C-alpha cells in the first residue's frame, strides 16, 4: 500500500520464535507488522560470491518481502513495503551473531538503509530471570550474561533466589510475550544511523581478510564489558564492540580445545556428567546425554550433545588417541570419518577405566 513504509517487518529466529512474536502482536495489533522466520543464520555476504547470494533463500526472501531493488542506494523508505526492519533473535550469543550478520548484509548490499534513522531496530528479551523469595518477593531481568554474572558475584548473597535461563524466545510463554510488547520502551531498541567510521568496524568483524586484526580486537576485550541495554538508541559501533564480540569470544572457547586438558567445554561436560553419574556400566547414548544435560546446565540441542558423546567413544584409526568412553555398538568408521554411526538410541557406552587415571579423583564431582 501507499503507507507500507510505516510498517515493520519482524525477523524471528525460527518458527517457534515466530509464534511468540505473533502472541506479542495481540497487544500492539497486526495492521503495521509482518513476520518472517529465518532458518538458521544468515549468509555472511561480505566475502560471498554473487552466485552464493543469489541462491540464498533467506536473503532473497528479505529482499522480496521488503521490496528492495538490487544495488539501489536508498535515501528514504517511501518506496519500500516495510519502512522498518526489526530483528527478534534470541538473546544468547548466537542471537547476537544473527543481529550482526543482518547489519553486515545491509551495510554490504544496501548501506543507505543503515543511514536512515529508525530503519533498523531490535526487540530484546531477558536471557535470565532471577526470582527472589527473601527478604521480599521480586523478579530481576538480565539481558546479557556479564550483567547477570556481576549481580551473582556481588549482590546475590543477600537474597534467597533461583533463576531461569531463557535459551530462546520459545522459552517465553504467551503471557510473558504480551508483557514484553506492553513495555516497548524497555524491549524495543533502535540502532543509531550508520556513522562515518562504523563501516570499518563491521568489516573488522566479518571480513576474512581482517583475521589478524580480529585477533587483536578480541585480545583487547576487557572481561565484564557489555552493552548498556538501558540505551534507547544503540550505536552500531557499540553493538559490535560490546555485544557481538561476546559471540566471537564464546565461539572460540567452544570451538578450540583447551591447552590444559585438550577438551572443548561440551566434551568436558560429558566427562564431568559421566563421572557424576558413575557411568561405568553400559548406558544408552541418548540416556547419557539426558544425564549430562541436567547435571551441567547444557543449553544447546540434544543432537549436538549426543554427537559429542559418540565422538568421545570413537576408536577407529585417525580419531581419539585415547577414547575416554568405551563404544558398544556402531560408533562410525574411518571411511566416513565417523558420520556413519548408528542413532544414539541404538548404541551404548560407558567410561573407560583409563579415564579415572587421567582425571584426578580430587577433580571429579
Residue ranges and their predicted role:
Residues 1-365:
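Conserved phosphate-chemistry cores used by DNA topoisomerases
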Amino acid at each position: 500500500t501507499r503507507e507500507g513504509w510505516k510498517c515493520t517487518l519482524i525477523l524471528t529466529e525460527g518458527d517457534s520464535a515466530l509464534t511468540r512474536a505473533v502472541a506479542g502482536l495481540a497487544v500492539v495489533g497486526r495492521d503495521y507488522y509482518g513476520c518472517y522466520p529465518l532458518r538458521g543464520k544468515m549468509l555472511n555476504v561480505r566475502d560471498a560470491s554473487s552466485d552464493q547470494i543469489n541462491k540464498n533463500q533467506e536473503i532473497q526472501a528479505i529482499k522480496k518481502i521488503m521490496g528492495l531493488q538490487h544495488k539501489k542506494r536508498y535515501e528514504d523508505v517511501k518506496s519500500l513495503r516495510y519502512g522498518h526492519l526489526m530483528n527478534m533473535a534470541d538473546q544468547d550469543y548466537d542471537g547476537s551473531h544473527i543481529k550482526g550478520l543482518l547489519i553486515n548484509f545491509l551495510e554490504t548490499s544496501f548501506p543507505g538503509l543503515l543511514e536512515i534513522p529508525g530503519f533498523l531496530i531490535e526487540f530484546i528479551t531477558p536471557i535470565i530471570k532471577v526470582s527472589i523469595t527473601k527478604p521480599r518477593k521480586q523478579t530481576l531481568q538480565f539481558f546479557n550474561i556479564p550483567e547477570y554474572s556481576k549481580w551473582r558475584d556481588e549482590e546475590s548473597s543477600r537474597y534467597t533466589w533461583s533463576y531461569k535461563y531463557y535459551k530462546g524466545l520459545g522459552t517465553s510463554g504467551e503471557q510473558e510475550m504480551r508483557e514484553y510488547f506492553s513495555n516497548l520502551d524497555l524491549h524495543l531498541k533502535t540502532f543509531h544511523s550508520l556513522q562515518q567510521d562504523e563501516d570499518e568496524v563491521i568489516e573488522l568483524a566479518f571480513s576474512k581478510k581482517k583475521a589478524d586484526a580480529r585477533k587483536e580486537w578480541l585480545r583487547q576485550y576487557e572481561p565484564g564489558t557489555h552493552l548498556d541495554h538501558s540505551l534507547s538508541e544503540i550505536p552500531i559501533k557499540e553493538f559490535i564492540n560490546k555485544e557481538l564480540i561476546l559471540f566471537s569470544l564464546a565461539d572460540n572457547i567452544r570451538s578450540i580445545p583447551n591447552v590444559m586438558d585438550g577438551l572443548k567445554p561440551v566434551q568436558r561436560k560429558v566427562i564431568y556428567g559421566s563421572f557424576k553419574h558413575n557411568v561405568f556400566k553400559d548406558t544408552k547414548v541418548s540416556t547419557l546425554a539426558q544425564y549430562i544435560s541436567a547435571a551441567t546446565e547444557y543449553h544447546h540441542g540434544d543432537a549436538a550433545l549426543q554427537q559429542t558423546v559418540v565422538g568421545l567413544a570413537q576408536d577407529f584409526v585417525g580419531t581419539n588417541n585415547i577414547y575416554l568412553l568405551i563404544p558398544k555398538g556402531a560408533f562410525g568408521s574411518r571411511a566416513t570419518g565417523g558420520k556413519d554411526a548408528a542413532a544414539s538410541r541404538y548404541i551404548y557406552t560407558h567410561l573407560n577405566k583409563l579415564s579415572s587415571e587421567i582425571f584426578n579423583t580430587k577433580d571429579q564431582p
